[in-house]
Amino acid sequence: MSDETFYITTPIYYVNGAPHIGHAYTTIVADAFARHYRQRGDDVFFLTGTDEHGLKVQRAAEEQDMSPQELCDENSAKFRDLFERMELTHDRFIRTTEEEHEEVVLDVVERMKQSGDIYLDTYEGWYSASDEAYYDESEIEDGKAPSGSEVEWVEEESYFFRLSNYEDELLDWYEQDATVAPEARKNEVKSFVEGGLDDLSITRTTFDWGITYPDDPDHVLYVWVDALTNYLTGIGRLHDEEMFEHFWPCDLHLVGKDILRFHAVYWPAFLFSADIEPPEQVFAHGWWLVEGEKMSKSKGNWVDAGELIDQYDLDVLSYFMLRELPFGNDGNFAKERLVERNNSE
């Protein structure tokens, strides 16, 4: 193995729906990084995969008269098939329903418990199933989350993580060079933490599609505790410690700006609690918009990446996505621009 390593990840993608060009963009960018560092001679590990637990997945399965596992199997295969068509060079495609992953999640939770950072209480507040996120009253406007997603009032017994214990440690981490980028995104999370952190509800009792909380079968773990830990599982945590030590900490978590808080606040705090080194950098890129709006199936402006490959060729699509959108910014997607870019360059 080379002494120089480069470990890059995409977020793992929800399986409540099929992949679209937003998923393709993140993964194409990550693939470009992976290819570049391999050409430099670095020992590269590129991880992607699917996020398969949570209320959103359970509800999507119910709507389609399927079991959650059936939905996960069907839609995870769609992501895997698309990535094969895109000729991506990922080293592993991880699924959070894998038994190996559950073992790693439970180990991280146990380490957080041993740190004294988990306690039982009652959660009352706003929750968005679409975002799989909790929101303060101050963040709700016209009955919706900042993302525009619908929210519901939740009151239930919950285990909490003492996120408030890690304000100073997080702020110190942000002061290190480029731990969160671009700079504007770092300033966002710094302001969020400086405003004071509430402890985080990390279990739910109103659905059962998830990893059961240890020693309390009425609770399942909050999907982000589960999902974020994939970055440890993917490089052998507990199962190949030599590989894990070789590649961790992660050099680059590449994420969309809508999930920055999870990766740049919750994730490093979980790692601090579990006595695991935090990542080197979290980079939040912008969104592909359609007529100024974020792409979503509910809005009917969803663009199928596979259809674009069929129509325009993989190289054309990949070049367009890397060339058209300034890295870190939002940009509007239009087929006319794709054709124009291809014909002019």
Where are these regions (language model features)?
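Structured secondary-structure scaffolds
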Residues: S2-G41, L47-T48, E100-V104, S147, ...
